[in-house]
Design a protein with these regions (language model features):
Chain A
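Sec-dependent signal peptide recognition
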Residues: 10-18
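N-terminal "domain-start" segment
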Residues: 26-158, 180-184, 190-211
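Glycine-centered tight beta-turn/hairpin loop motif at sheet-sheet or coil-to-beta transitions
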Residues: 165-169
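A short beta-strand micro-motif
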Residues: 160-164
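N-terminal secretory signal peptides that target proteins for export/translocation
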Residues: 1-9
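C-terminal motif of bacterial Sec signal peptides marking the signal peptidase cleavage site
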Residues: 21-24
Length: 211, 692
């Protein structure tokens, strides 16, 4: 897994933009920490089962704040194949990690850049019957194209909004389900269950804006 | 083994015919071709002069077929205006008419339906052009005469009939690239009231491979045989009798199964049909016609290892039909046709546990009314009653109005439908390697209950209804025909097809092991509309130009609504960012080209004995799959580029019985190895023809 901090890239490339961003933050509230915009590439979330068999294997737990995979209870979301869990609510199966936080989430329709506020009324936690991020083709973040391509493609214009395990907010866009995010993935030759996504993390408690 | 026997038979009969060729060639070879007043049978189920037709139609003549150099139906059909062939599994080719998918065009041989739509599409490359007299194409829904499947239109292949007295023969041999061989022996004999005719055609090829090193060929080697045996007897006042037997057999390496090392893939197709047609003029004004028809199609796909068969897929379909019709003519030139009959269709198929049998009765009526010299109105209606679906009532009205001798207006409205096929009703298919299940609506309740009882079901969204409706369309055509001069006909036709209840596969559930469960439902509405222009021109005696153009818009109604609601986005392939699409970014349905252009040039040289034919077929850009993550085809998707395919044929008469042909297909060697798998590039063919 590789992380790229977009803000530090921007800092090097375009100091002016950063200054504007910073200034706008300062104008709102001088004590706020700056938001973090990140890209995560090749996060592996593999099942150990064969196709057609019950899914098995550990969920890969991720922390927006730590910008990495974590082992403890401070995870915000967890991945296994196409399933995404939030660290809030109840587990639907025994092999899921137990929920210890207050995380929640929903799927927003809209371009990543245009979704700048959290609609708290839409937030849902995982439960025994449904996940905050719905599973199934066309229901949540992906489409399963079926035969003959069998591709899993992240639906364009689906932004995942999360409340983290400790009550901060993040927005996230999944860009690819295949290793190295190929331009034209092939389900038969490209390694699947490997996520590339970008996210924006709002580290300030209670702030619902990503501006 | 049977085909080897038949191959020997062909060889033997060919030798006999060739050795006899000089003895029997007594007929005068007429250089002059007299343009007979062409008639069409498909539009009215009875002969009607082509120029008087009220519906958009096209005839491909025997001469055009022979001069073109083509061997199979798909090749010549794809050169027609507004027709595109679409590749399916294993080198099969379906037809797209007025932008409507291959499942929805009825294919007939001598007026009787061809069956064997294994995956919905009827493979036109199955049909040989050897011994074809002409091909009739009707555009627009025609269920008022033909019932199910005639939603986009009808293609009727008319095979050669015996006309002349005495012993006739026609033999040819064609050799081409990829070791493609096409051989025909056609013999007929007529004496007074009795005629017998038979022909046998063998077509084989080594196939070709566009992408080497992927372990499988693009089109595998195959050989097939098409045979026909017919008897004709004129019993004077008792009428005419036609008895016809046709067969098709094909062996192909490779199947729908994925190729693996050490495993041999084999595909075998057997098709047999027999028809008895009885015609009698009961009185001066009444004609009786009875068709009795039985056809059987068997396809076997096998994966074979040295110690046995490891995987098998069988498809065994049969259809029996009786169609009785009476035509009553009046003195004014008007006539009405009344017909009735029944169909019985059966299927045995791997992954279908039941052996479904469909029975239907039908009744149709058509009135061809010549109100005066200028106005011809044809109206008809057909009623189909089916043991498994709700009955269908299919009307059609069409007219032709002559403003003058040079200018006329044609218009038609027709209803077309297609009953759900056996797959959509009875399939119970489980793919263990990629993990999904497909269930037909008639078996879904049973299977779901079983899964529930075994605690194997995670969720199931119950189908709104397990009663699939027939897919149907309302089709409208309006056209002008204008003779600029008697030699320059120009035709423009506007069309619109509103298609309802399109059947789609949807996810309905999931098993506890993660397998997705698919089923079928009537969801989509779509339309196709466009303009078709065609004409021909004889500027000088030895030169003929003909051309056509089609503008096509084919769209899904739900997709249009999604785009309008602003919920459709696309992902940029480089930046991976999503952006919102606007209404006008929606391109339309897959595999449809907005523009299609055909141009033909024919030179007659050497005192009308020989000819050169050039054809240019342009197909505008089209999309095959969504490439930017929104399940729709939009302007930012990857398209297959617009391209021209050009053919040239040279026909040379050596003596009055011998001629030859050089045919180069795809002269400029246009290829797209990834997307156009049905195009192997440039192909050379050489053909020798012996006849009398």
């Amino acid at each position: 897994m590789i992380l790229i901090n977009i803000r530090s890239m921007i800092k090097k490339l375009n100091l002016l933009l950063l200054t504007l961003l910073f200034v706008s933050c300062v104008d709102d509230d001088p004590v706020l920490e700056p938001i973090e915009a990140m890209i995560v590439t090749n996060l592996e979330a593999k099942t150990t089962s064969q196709p057609g068999q019950p899914l098995s294997g550990d969920f890969v737990k991720f922390s927006f704040e730590k910008q990495t995979v974590v082992e403890g209870d401070d995870w915000d979301i967890a991945f296994r194949a196409t399933t995404i869990l939030v660290n809030g609510g109840f587990a639907a199966a025994d092999d899921e990690p137990s929920r210890t936080g207050i995380a929640a989430g929903y799927v927003a329709v809209g371009a990543y850049g245009s979704i700048n506020n959290v609609d708290e009324s839409l937030l849902k936690q995982d439960s025994e019957t449904a996940y905050a991020v719905p599973t199934g083709s066309g229901n949540g973040w992906y489409n399963y194209e079926g035969p003959p391509t069998h591709l899993i493609t992240p639906i364009a214009g689906r932004t995942l909004i999360f409340k983290t395990h400790n009550g901060r907010y993040a927005k996230m866009e999944i860009q690819s389900y295949y290793k190295d995010a190929p331009e034209s993935p092939n389900a038969f030759t490209d390694e699947a269950q490997v996520y590339t996504f970008n996210y924006t993390y709002q580290p300030n408690e209670g702030v619902i804006s990503f501006d | 083994m049977r085909s080897k026997y038949i191959s020997k038979l062909i060889l033997l009969s060919t030798i006999i015919v060739i050795s006899n060729i000089n003895v029997f060639s007594q007929n005068e070879d007429s250089i002059k071709t007299i343009e007979m007043k062409e008639v069409m049978v498909s539009a009215n189920k009875t002969e009607k002069p082509f120029v008087e037709l009220t519906v958009p139609a096209k005839i491909i003549s025997k001469k055009e077929i022979e001069n073109s150099g083509h061997s199979r139906l798909d090749e010549i059909i794809s050169e027609q205006v507004g027709i595109i062939t679409v590749p399916g599994f294993g080198g099969s080719e379906g037809v797209q008419l007025q932008g409507i998918d291959p499942e929805y065009t009825l294919i007939l041989i001598d007026g009787l339906p061809v069956i064997g739509r294994v995956a919905g599409t009827l493979d036109l490359s199955r049909i040989s052009l050897a011994s074809v007299e002409k091909i009739e194409i009707i555009k627009g829904a025609s269920s008022s005469l033909y019932g199910s499947e005639a939603l986009g239109g009808v293609i009727n292949i008319i095979t050669r009939k015996v006309k002349d007295e005495g012993f006739k023969k026609n033999v040819y041999y064609q050799y081409g690239s990829y070791n493609t061989q096409d051989i025909l022996t056609d013999i007929s004999f007529r004496k007074n009231k009795f005629a017998v005719f038979g022909n046998i055609n063998r077509y084989s090829s080594n196939g070709y491979d566009l992408i080497e090193g992927d372990g499988q060929k693009t089109v595998e080697a195959f050989q097939n045989i098409t045979g026909n045996l017919g008897l004709y007897y004129n019993m004077n006042k008792l009428g005419n009798l036609n008895l016809n037997y046709k067969l098709f057999e094909e062996d192909r390496d490779g199947t729908v199964f994925i190729t693996s090392p050490g495993i041999e893939n084999k595909s075998e197709t057997n098709e047999n049909n027999i028809s008895l047609i009885y015609q009698n003029k009961l009185s001066k004004s009444v004609d009786l016609n009875i068709d009795i028809y039985k056809t059987k199609y068997l396809n076997k796909e096998q994966q074979v290892v040295p110690n046995g068969i490891i995987n098998e897929n069988n498809f065994d379909q049969s259809l029996s039909r009786v169609d009785v019709r009476l035509k009553h003519s009046t003195s004014s030139g008007s006539y009405y046709t009344i017909g009735f009959g029944y169909d019985n269709e059966k299927l045995e198929r791997t992954n279908i546990s039941v052996k479904p049998e469909h029975k239907s009765q039908f009744l149709y009526f058509q009135y061809d009314w010549k109100t005066n010299n200028k106005f011809n109105l044809v109206s008809g209606i057909r009623y189909d009653s089916h043991n498994k679906y709700s009955s269908q009532l299919s009307p059609k009205v069409s007219f032709k109005y002559d403003f003058s001798e040079d200018l006329n207006l044609k218009g038609s409205f027709g209803y077309g439908y297609k009953t759900p096929d056996f797959r959509q009703l009875y399939l119970n298919f489980s793919n263990s390697t990629s993990g999904y299940i497909v269930l037909g609506v008639s078996v879904i309740d049973e299977v779901i209950t079983e899964l529930q009882n075994n605690n194997e079901l995670m969720f199931y969204d119950e189908l709104f209804t397990t009663n699939l409706l027939a897919e149907n369309s309302n089709s409208y055509n309006l056209g002008l025909q204008y003779y600029v001069t008697p030699d320059i006909p120009l035709e423009i036709n506007l069309f619109r097809n509103n298609i309802y209840n399109l059947i789609e596969t949807n996810i309905v559930g999931r098993k506890t092991n993660g397998q997705t469960i698919y089923s079928y439902s009537n969801v989509n509405k779509a339309f196709t509309q466009g303009i078709e222009i065609q004409g021909s021109w004889n500027p000088i005696k030895i030169l003929t130009l003909d051309g056509g153009y089609q503008l096509l818009y084919a769209k899904d109604i739900e997709a249009i609504e999604s785009f309008q609601s602003g919920t459709v986005f696309a992902r940029d392939r480089i930046t991976k960012q999503s952006f919102e699409l606007k209404s006008n970014d929606y391109f339309g349905l897959y595999s449809r080209s907005r523009h299609q252009l055909n141009l033909g040039v024919s030179f007659i040289i050497n005192q009308i004995r020989d000819n050169i034919n050039l054809r240019f077929n342009y197909r505008g850009k089209f999309g095959l799959v969504d490439t930017n993550n929104n399940s729709f085809l939009d302007r930012y998707d990857n398209f297959i580029k617009g391209h021209v395919l050009s053919n040239i044929s040279f026909n040379k008469v050596i003596t009055k019985n011998i001629s030859f042909q050089i045919f180069i297909k795809n002269i400029f060697n246009y290829k797209d190895e990834v997307n156009l798998v049905n195009n192997p590039g440039r192909i050379y063919n050489f053909k020798v023809i012996l006849n009398n």
